[in-house]
Amino acid sequence: MSLYGMIQRAGASGFGYNSTTDNVTEGLDLHGKTYLVTGINSGLGLETIRILSERGATIVGSARSEAKAREAMAGLPGPTFPLACELSEPPSVRAAVATVLAAGHRLDAIIANAGVMALPERTVHHGLEMQFLTNHIGHSLLVTGLLPALTPTGRVVMLSSAAHWQTYREGVRLDDLDAAKRYTSWGAYGQSKLCNLLFARELAKRLPAGQTANAVHPGVIATNLVRHVLPDALTGLWRSAGTALALKTIPQGAATQVYVATHPAAASITGEYWADCNVHKSSKHGRNDELAAALWAKTEELQTKL
């Protein structure tokens, strides 16, 4: 347990900062349920599919290639369905959607876990800044495409982050989505995480009663995402010193998305931002319904061109 974790207490849900995926699913029987999780080959995604499978669920797991997805799920005890989905390539996302629909899967939750973080250099692909394209456009295309497969009580869980507070001053730069005017690694990452939050907020309004959409902050965790942020020589120091002081373990970091996707107490809560397995207050941009609606409209416009 980190030093910061030692002073944290459980919230209204009965869980909190120190809760793990095992804690939040204790006593749950997920046999007969199916969960689609993106980015399963490492970190939070790998931990998420581990616990869901151990509780009896069927896993539809995606990675950038079917081989990577298959490898990640090789040791799971329950049924699995490997899926190739490169989120920065719209044709790959559409193919993944078609594969899932053709297979007839009924999804109890979609956990949009994959992402890229704080790319040091501005990277543009398909005319869009890479973090916006991958973290937001790719996932929004996947989720909306899979809505016909969502069960009547299905849940959508978008992996956002407290980094959404670090977005650009405007919130989402809808007139500069290729970051041509100005690029900062954390501003662009924060914008993409704000988009994940706003997407969940707007989707929650559009889903029929019984279905939910929420965004989650996993906490600060030493995962492979830091490979773009720190030199190799510092990554080990970040993991060891950071874990001792404040970082969550991976099972703690994945707990919130697993809780929101599975726990009966979260079944009727929608349109919220979660952290430490409890509803939290987001930034003012994260609560801006006009911005959420504008982002939704812009996203639909972009998707028709990709």
Language-model-derived ranges and their functions:
Residues R9-F15, S192, A215, S240-H280, ...:
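C-terminal helical subdomain
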Residues L177-A180, D232-T243:
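A short C-terminal helix-loop "cap" of Rossmann-like NAD(P)-dependent dehydrogenase/epimerase domains
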Residues G286-L306:
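C-terminal amphipathic/interface module of NAD(P)-dependent oxidoreductases
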Residues E202, T256-Y259, K298:
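Generic recognition of well-ordered alpha-helical segments
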Residues G61, C85, L245, K284-R287:
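Pocket-edge positions in alpha/beta enzyme catalytic cores
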Residues L119-P120, S282-H285:
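A generic structural signal for short coil/turn motifs at secondary-structure boundaries
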Residues S2-M6, S13-V229, L302-L306:
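Rossmann-fold NAD(P)H-dependent dehydrogenase/reductase core
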